[in-house]
Amino acid sequence: MTARLNAYDQPVGDPLPGWTARAAPARVDLDGAYCRLEPLDAERHAGDLYAAYATETDGRNWTYLPEEPFDSEEGYRRWAQAAARSADPLHYAVIDRAADRAVGTLSLMRHDPANGVIEVGYVVFSPLIQRTPLSTEAQYLLMAYAFDKLGYRRYEWKCDALNTPSRKAAERLGFTFEGVFRQAVVYKGRNRDTAWYSVVDSEWPALREAFRAWLAPENFREDGEQRHPLSTLMNTASHTARSATADSGS
């Protein structure tokens, strides 16, 4: 790639003509085939969420979160009431459409509308949603909202560098690993080195195509097993996009 040079022969970034600050995310419902994302509401969601989290056999899913497992529904409800009032992070409940109940939460956080940057975080999925199409669709719906509706340029994922499941999830969802910020956070009385991942807007069309193909009913057998892994579909979509770009430039 040929660098752009300014009047002093210094390399500079690509121009962004007409760029304007993006809107902050709103408290809107996001509908999918398997799930629906609703702005967190303690009165509507706390009971279902506490029950969903109570299906965990131990507290390992909370190791890398700021909180510990809640020991009562009332304790979780108080947390949910405070979280529901927050604008950043903006928390969403994941509603299982088939069961019509909340089974997890995730949020859009660290909003930077001026630069078009936003982060998905505070992902707390119960065993009822883990490793199901619902969990993938929930991530897709929020990513599509950030890129397609709000017009953001960069979508981030950050986690404790020791949190292997989170890192694998980011990679499966198409995020690119960017590095580790050492000694970035102190939480629960211990150090956290933070692993950084991102998706940028130029990558999103291929990822969107892959998500849609993976979530399509025909990608699942009668027993619920996937026919094509998401990674395979992402590789195919990315290759097609690169080929189209090369052809247009030839």
Predicted regions and their residues:
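Conserved GNAT acetyl-CoA-binding A-motif
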Residues: 148-158
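Glycine-rich acyl-CoA binding loop
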Residues: 135
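Flexible ATP-lid and adjacent glycine-rich G1/G2 motifs of the Bergerat
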Residues: 142
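GNAT-family acyltransferases
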Residues: 1-132, 145, 149, 190-195, ...
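Conserved active-site tyrosine of GNAT-family acetyltransferases
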Residues: 169-170, 197
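Conserved catalytic-core motifs of GNAT/GCN5-like acyltransferases
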Residues: 176-190
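Conserved beta-strand-loop-alpha-helix junction that forms the acyl-donor binding cleft
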Residues: 157-167
